[in-house]
Design a protein with these regions (language model features):
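Conserved Class I S-adenosyl-L-methionine-dependent methyltransferase catalytic core
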Residues: 2-4, 10-40, 48, 52, ...
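Alpha-helical subdomain
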Residues: 1-77, 91, 177-178, 182-347
């Protein structure tokens, strides 16, 4: 986002500097489940929304809130102030209605409930190099605490599902799985990627591999999408256990959680579990090699500072270097949706 003129302007500075205002307006609407309520009723007046959500602000401030969502394109509006009827836009009706399988609000819920506050400590994170999440004040590291707290774990799993489901669908359709028979998703969480691969590729036998705490969620996903004949959930620890053998092995938003040493260790374990001709695929917000376009990838990498201290997102050149170091024959990249890509290593 740059000033395209030769004249100085504060516009972009103020747009970014006040960006947390816009962010919090959307996050509050998601937290209120506003878009889900609107999907049920098709349209509502401000008064109906105020009563349903039990809001005690002035009518004027409620109009400000709803009309800001309208200006952002998240709501449609027919009428004005007291006469206005509000309804979902195409995007929010598709992706922020909790009753649709396309719901991606889990990530926004986690941003609102956890990350919004933690990012207030970005300066401290940059100064100290230390995590700024629950572990900051003597708590356990993020993944240890997640898997011990069912409520926190469910929120995290829903967040990861929300941010990746579109990318998983894209990979399942864009990558040529016709040459392969078996598929393993390491750190598979709720099993969405394995489910999508099975749904779009009847030739594939899929395994979602993660800690025992998420096996029930994965089985629930498998049943929901009616792919139990093709997909199974297997419990294991990708740090301490060998990976099950498979023709294609994936990791979705896994490598970026760790430092380079652990990234290489995980890629080596994938290499060892693949046959000759097998494929390893990492799905991430891969940063462009020149580090000047994928700003979301850069922000995601800073989020790793907040959450893990030494995890980081990376470029395709980084991935290519690591893959060759391990022994993969070649690499390629496949764009998915938005800022996310699949980086692929062939054994």
């Amino acid at each position: 986002m740059k000033n395209q003129t030769n004249q100085p302007s504060p516009a972009v500075i103020m747009q970014i500097g006040s960006g947390f205002w816009a962010s919090k307006i959307l996050l509050a609407a998601v937290n209120f489940e506003l878009f889900t309520h609107l999907a049920r009723k098709e349209s509502m007046s401000a008064r109906e929304i105020k009563d349903l959500l039990k809001l005690n602000c002035t009518d004027r401030h409620l109009f400000d809130f709803l009309d800001a969502l309208f200006c952002f394109g998240f709501l449609k509006r027919d009428g004005f102030l007291e006469t206005a009827q509000y309804s979902n836009s195409l995007d929010t009706g598709t992706f922020l209605d909790k009753e649709k399988t396309s719901y991606m609000g889990g990530m926004l819920e986690m941003m609102n409930n956890r990350l919004y506050g933690f990012w207030g400590n970005l300066e401290e994170g940059l100064k100290t190099g230390l995590v700024q999440n629950e572990a900051k004040n003597g708590g356990e590291p993020i993944f240890e605490s997640l898997y011990k707290d069912p409520k926190l774990l469910k929120g995290f799993v829903n967040a990861m599902t929300g941010i990746q489901i579109g990318n998983f669908m894209a990979l399942a359709q864009k990558f040529d799985f016709s040459k392969y028979k078996t598929f393993l998703d390491v750190g598979g969480s709720a099993g969405i990627l394995s489910t999508m691969v099975a749904k779009y590729n009847s030739n594939m036998s899929c395994t979602t591999f993660d800690l025992p705490a998420v096996e029930a969620m994965a089985n629930e996903t498998i049943q929901k999408f009616e792919v139990s004949a093709q997909v199974k959930a297997v419990s294991g620890d990708f740090f301490t256990d060998s990976f099950p053998k498979a023709d294609v092995i994936t990791m979705g938003n896994i490598l970026h959680d760790w430092n380079e040493e652990n990234k290489l260790m995980l890629m080596q374990k994938a290499y060892d579990a693949l046959p000759d001709g097998g494929v390893f695929i990492a799905i991430e917000s891969v940063i462009d090699n020149e580090r000047k376009q994928n700003v979301f990838g850069l922000m995601m990498s800073l989020n790793m500072l907040i959450e893990t201290a030494d995890g980081f997102d990376y470029t395709f050149d980084d991935f290519n270097k690591w893959a060759k170091q391990i022994g993969f024959k070649s690499t390629s990249s496949l764009g998915l949706t938005g800022p996310t890509s699949a980086v692929i290593a062939y054994k």
